[in-house]
UniProtKB/Swiss-Prot annotation:
Protein name: Methylthioribose-1-phosphate isomerase
Group of enzyme by EC: isomerase
Pathway assigned in UniProt: Amino-acid biosynthesis; L-methionine biosynthesis via salvage pathway; L-methionine from S-methyl-5-thio-alpha-D-ribose 1-phosphate: step 1/6
GO biological process: L-methionine salvage from methylthioadenosine
E.C. number(s) listed in UniProt: 5.3.1.23
HAMAP family: Salvage_MtnA (MF_01678)
Any GO MF annotation of the entry: S-methyl-5-thioribose-1-phosphate isomerase activity
Entry keyword set: Amino-acid biosynthesis, Isomerase, Methionine biosynthesis
Pfam family, one: IF-2B
Organism from which the protein derives: Cronobacter sakazakii (strain ATCC BAA-894) (Enterobacter sakazakii)
Reaction equations catalysed: 5-(methylsulfanyl)-alpha-D-ribose 1-phosphate = 5-(methylsulfanyl)-D-ribulose 1-phosphate
Family (UniProt): Belongs to the eIF-2B alpha/beta/delta subunits family. MtnA subfamily.
Binding sites annotated in the UniProt record for substrate: 49-51, 86, 187, 238-239
Membrane-spanning segments: none
């Protein structure tokens, strides 16, 4: 396979490398993903994360395994193991469905390689379309609030919600970005803050519980988030805490936008109640670990509830910005996502 580089993925000498997003921003470590077990481990540990990026990393690995001589049957088994790595992220399922089709071709090695590279290029292009469509909704002088991380670290391109902010900033329309730290794993504080700093976008980091106070003071003009899955009725699964922001935004009459690619749509999923929600380890809540080491603050026997995602009802969303354009609540009510 040709050499490939994104913010978080590399293919060099027919080997897949991932940027360890658990070590950022203090350390920039590239880790190998030589086999299915290694990549699944990286996904579970959130060293590679973001719904689009997870799908792309799995697709690239399958293509590389094929080039290294793995049989068709073994590749089919590897594909299903990868499919189970992150159940909420429908991009992974959609990408692997396309790779599964490529696997049926007579020259499956070439077909898998071509399809994986096509998926990367498509993601770059659709991120740009999302970013430009969304930036048109941003008013001059806007103070925007975002949650989790939805930029180049989570995609092959400029990103989804963070891509919108980046393009709006280039147009001179962003006065400030409020960055939720995004408990418990701090993707906002670690990753989004780092990306915005690299882009030169003015931002201020806040704890998740400060959003209500800012909205009450009129300090937030719009909220922009990404999505891991969008159901047929417009309900959105995204990083835990998104639902809270949507409720706050509705109460304070602040527009709440979701930016995501078409591949995040799941027409077969009728509503948010049907979306599987990943439950994660208690240690993520009882303490914190990073390049600085590990600290535990909760009692050893503390019981923990730690869902990775929550579901935001469509009724709380002002608009869905896809690579195909802006979808309104009226469009969704008329079955736009129902397939």
């Amino acid at each position: 396979m040709q050499t490939l580089q994104t913010t978080s993925l590399r293919v060099v000498d027919n080997k897949l490398w991932i940027l360890d997003q658990q070590a950022l921003p203090q350390q920039k470590n590239w880790l190998p993903a030589d086999n299915t077990e290694a990549l699944v481990g990286h996904i579970h540990a959130l060293r590679v994360r973001g719904a689009p990026l997870i799908g792309l990393s799995a697709s690239l690995l399958l293509a590389l395994l094929a080039e290294h001589g793995m049989t068709r049957d073994a590749l089919g088994q590897a594909l299903e193991v990868l499919r189970a790595a992150r159940p909420t992220a429908v991009n992974l399922m959609n990408n692997l469905d396309r790779m599964k089709q490529a696997l049926t071709q007579p020259d499956f090695v070439a077909a898998l390689g071509a399809e994986a590279l096509r998926l990367v290029q498509e993601d770059r292009e659709l991120c740009e379309r999302i970013a430009r469509a969304g930036s048109e909704l941003v008013k001059p002088g806007s103070r925007l609030l975002t949650h989790c991380n939805t930029g180049g670290l989570a995609t092959a391109g400029v990103g989804t919600a963070l891509g919108v902010i980046a393009r709006a900033h280039e147009a001179g329309k962003v006065a400030n970005v409020w960055v939720d730290e995004t408990r418990p794993l701090l993707q906002g504080g670690r990753l989004t803050a780092w990306e915005l700093g690299e882009l030169g976008v003015p931002y201020q980091l806040i704890t998740d519980s400060m959003a209500a106070s800012l909205m009450a003071q009129g300090q937030v003009d719009a909220v922009w988030v990404g999505a891991d899955r969008i159901a047929a009725n417009g309900d959105v699964a995204n990083k835990i805490g998104t639902y809270s922001l949507a409720v706050l935004a509705k109460f304070h009459n602040v527009p709440f936008y979701v930016a995501a690619p078409q591949t995040t749509l799941d027409p077969a999923c009728p509503n948010g109640a049907a979306i599987p929600i990943e439950q994660r380890a208690a240690a993520e809540v009882t303490g914190v670990a990073g390049s600085f080491g590990a600290v535990q603050w909760a009692p050893e026997d503390a019981r923990v509830y730690n869902p990775a995602f929550d579901v935001t009802p469509a009724a709380l969303i002002s608009g869905w910005v896809l690579d195909s354009g802006v979808v309104t609540p009226e469009d969704v009510a008329n079955g736009r996502f129902a397939g």
